[in-house]
Amino acid sequence: MSKKIGILTSGGDAPGMNSAISFLTKSALSLGFEPYLIFDGYSGIIARKILPAKNFPYNGISSFGGTAIGSSRFPEFKKEEVQNKAVEILSEIGISSLVVVGGDGTYNGGYKLHLKGIKVIALPGTIDNDIQFTDYTIGFDTALNTIVETIDKLRDTANSHRRCFVVEVMGRHCQDLALYSAMATGSEILITNTNILSPEEVSQKVLEQFAKGKPSVIVTITENILPNLKEFAAKIEELTKISTRSLEVGHTQRGGRPSAFDRILAAKMAMKAMELINQDKSGLAISYLDGKIQTFDIAKVVSNPVRKTNDLVLEINKINQN
């Protein structure tokens, strides 16, 4: 078994990735492996941006957001000839094992390399929390806290002016950021891809909330639902005659110092990944499920849809309107 191991982060960055990089490197060294850092995701393999980790300041990066080795989306990696080129380059260097940190695209890329003979272990690194068979992904907790802090501040000013705020959060096609931020902040109205409401329906609910004497209303919505957030807010104001503002939380959700939870989660997952590599395992995804670090076949993860939380969305909508 080759002692050279590649480490890469791919797709959208997530707070906690640096903790994963640091602990993967330190764990690899402690087990006698020779870790290599691959910069800018899968594109870094093709561009040969591969350096020995010993030449990189991997200590002390766990407290920083983003990913110190860069990340990118590389749709060309879906082509088999590009995958073959990646295997060729890794083999030339002597890298036989690869740890990938990212979301579903990263998992799919890793699975393809696994099928071509590279030993691959995957860690879930995405703020969207949209990886199957894990309760939490690296970065989700930090992003959630960023959203909660933002909505809490909006609530203060909304209360002062008796306003309605429509807040759009990330999540791609997963509603977890919207759902759990609504739970944490008491957002009166929650709109997700499983609970889409028209401006007329939202306006009626807004009026009902103010009629109960509430000084403000927060509408939390997951991205990729509304064609235009400002127009949606303007329509609510037109229908209710209540001052309504909109806010897209945006890429601040991706940044910031990772929470202690994300740092520890990434560290534990990294240590488990190196344990598996030391056992010459491949094609596995690390998860945090039911309070424990577990493993699943990557094939099973990439072939399953995101878990459903539809009932909880409806329940939170009902509870928060009281």
Curated annotation (Swiss-Prot):
Q: Name one GO cellular component term.
A: 6-phosphofructokinase complex
Gene Ontology terms describing biological process: canonical glycolysis; fructose 1,6-bisphosphate metabolic process; fructose 6-phosphate metabolic process
UniProt KW keywords? Allosteric enzyme, ATP-binding, Cytoplasm, Glycolysis, Kinase, Magnesium, Metal-binding, Nucleotide-binding, Transferase
* Biochemical pathway: Carbohydrate degradation; glycolysis; D-glyceraldehyde 3-phosphate and glycerone phosphate from D-glucose: step 3/4
Family matches, as InterPro entries: ATP_PFK, ATP_PFK_prok-type, PFKA_ATP_prok, Phosphofructokinase_CS, Phosphofructokinase_dom, PKF_sf
- Leading EC class: transferase
Per UniProt, ADP binds at 155, 186-188, 212, 214-216
**Residues annotated as catalytic:** 128
Q: Which residues bind ATP?
A: 12, 73-74, 103-106
Record-listed substrate binding positions: 126-128, 163, 170-172, 223, 245, 251-254
Q: Where in the cell is it found?
A: Cytoplasm
Tell me what reaction this enzyme catalyses. Answer: beta-D-fructose 6-phosphate + ATP = beta-D-fructose 1,6-bisphosphate + ADP + H(+)
Q: What is its EC number?
A: 2.7.1.11
State the family named in the UniProt similarity comment for this chain: Belongs to the phosphofructokinase type A (PFKA) family. ATP-dependent PFK group I subfamily. Prokaryotic clade 'B1' sub-subfamily.
What is the annotated role of this protein in its UniProt record? Answer: Catalyzes the phosphorylation of D-fructose 6-phosphate to fructose 1,6-bisphosphate by ATP, the first committing step of glycolysis.
Full protein name: ATP-dependent 6-phosphofructokinase
Organism listed in the record: Mesomycoplasma hyopneumoniae (strain 7448) (Mycoplasma hyopneumoniae)
The encoding gene: pfkA
